[in-house]
Amino acid sequence: MSRVYNFCSGPAALPEAVLKKAQAELLDWHGAGVSVMEMSHRSSEFMSILASAKARLSRLMNISDDYEILFVQGGASTLFSQIPANLANGFESACFLDTGAWSSKAIKEAKKYTKVNVVGSSKAQNYTTVPDFSTLELDESAAYLHICPNETIGGLEFADLPETNLPIVADLSSTILSRKVDVSKYGVIYAGAQKNVGPAGVVICIIRKDLLARSSDDLPAIWNFAHLAENDSMINTPPTFAIYLADLVFEWLEAQGGVEAIEQINIRKAQALYDFIDSSNFYSNPVDPVYRSRMNVPFILADESLEALFLQESEAAGLRTLAGHRSVGGMRASIYNAMPMEGIEALIEFMRGFEERHG
């Protein structure tokens, strides 16, 4: 068996060490005689897994006791509705920064629950840059400000935050644990697992405890952040195996030196790929260099008719899932934490050879 380099935007590659450990423990977790997939979510064994996952994540992100860590079922798209349903209660509106496809989806869903104030948008620039924060039309009486600091489809990322007293709600699905984040500056951080954390099916939700009081008892219990916090994310059976794998990924990340260490690796990976693209007359990236994503690198071939051949030859070379999102086309390399530098080097070597053959 030979594994390929998987550049899928999600579900994304997992560290091979994590997969091997899960494989070794699959039939018998730590002598329990059962798989994690089979054990009761209220057993002492699973409770220890859940506690470990929360503790490791707290260490990795330096999360204070002012925050609650929830493991929410579904994907981040579920939170597009769940967040306004909980946090906009008692408020007339919520503010949103529109920087790409995922911001737009969050805006669309939030409109079903509250008045949405789009305080800034880069749609007119085809989402290749970020609005000037000094021009944002923030309503300080709103429920919160929602942002998506990394847009996977457009390959755009920003690290700075707007100046506001509003709770900042951030979709970090594609950047969580890839770079250092000051959690204390956020009201809510949420992230679907299937990019940098584990398999699909669970969402990490880090919520400032004072915001839990906004959740109304009229909400379904399974959607109520306060009820989820009171029940340690276990109002019903949580996605146990996904949480277990997340804990293994957290363990792996600690062994790499933590978020600070992986961030430096991610900088080197992204810089190498962007440097090659910029040096080429055959490939190009449309995003403002200031806001290029470290996690998702879209690129365009000079001759669009060669795209199918590029994908065919790259897959044959062991470079999987390089097609851009169906809404934008082109190519895209998603290079999350689990992608080693060797994968970037292999991609660059292939791209150089393809250009020599077809450029």
UniProtKB/Swiss-Prot annotation:
UniProt-annotated binding residues for pyridoxal 5'-phosphate: 76-77, 102, 152, 171, 194, 236-237
Sample GO molecular function, one term: O-phospho-L-serine:2-oxoglutarate aminotransferase activity
Modified residues (N6-(pyridoxal phosphate)lysine): 195
Domain of life from the UniProt record: Bacteria
Annotated EC: 2.6.1.52
Major subcellular location class: cytoplasm
InterPro entries documented for this protein: Aminotrans_V_dom, Pser_aminoTfrase, PyrdxlP-dep_Trfase, PyrdxlP-dep_Trfase_major, PyrdxlP-dep_Trfase_small
Gene Ontology CC: one annotated term: cytoplasm
Keyword Aminoacyl-tRNA synthetase: no
Involved pathway(s): Amino-acid biosynthesis; L-serine biosynthesis; L-serine from 3-phospho-D-glycerate: step 2/3; Cofactor biosynthesis; pyridoxine 5'-phosphate biosynthesis; pyridoxine 5'-phosphate from D-erythrose 4-phosphate: step 3/5
Gene Ontology biological-process annotations: L-serine biosynthetic process; pyridoxine biosynthetic process
Reactions accelerated catalytically: O-phospho-L-serine + 2-oxoglutarate = 3-phosphooxypyruvate + L-glutamate; 4-(phosphooxy)-L-threonine + 2-oxoglutarate = (R)-3-hydroxy-2-oxo-4-phosphooxybutanoate + L-glutamate
Pfam families: Aminotran_5 (PF00266)
Cofactor: pyridoxal 5'-phosphate
Keywords per UniProt: Amino-acid biosynthesis, Aminotransferase, Cytoplasm, Pyridoxal phosphate, Pyridoxine biosynthesis, Serine biosynthesis, Transferase
Binding residues annotated for L-glutamate, in chain numbering: 9, 42
Signal peptide: none
Cofactor binding comment, as recorded: Binds 1 pyridoxal phosphate per subunit.
Subunit structure: Homodimer.
Entry's family note: Belongs to the class-V pyridoxal-phosphate-dependent aminotransferase family. SerC subfamily.
Job of this protein: Catalyzes the reversible conversion of 3-phosphohydroxypyruvate to phosphoserine and of 3-hydroxy-2-oxo-4-phosphonooxybutanoate to phosphohydroxythreonine.
Descriptive protein name: Phosphoserine aminotransferase
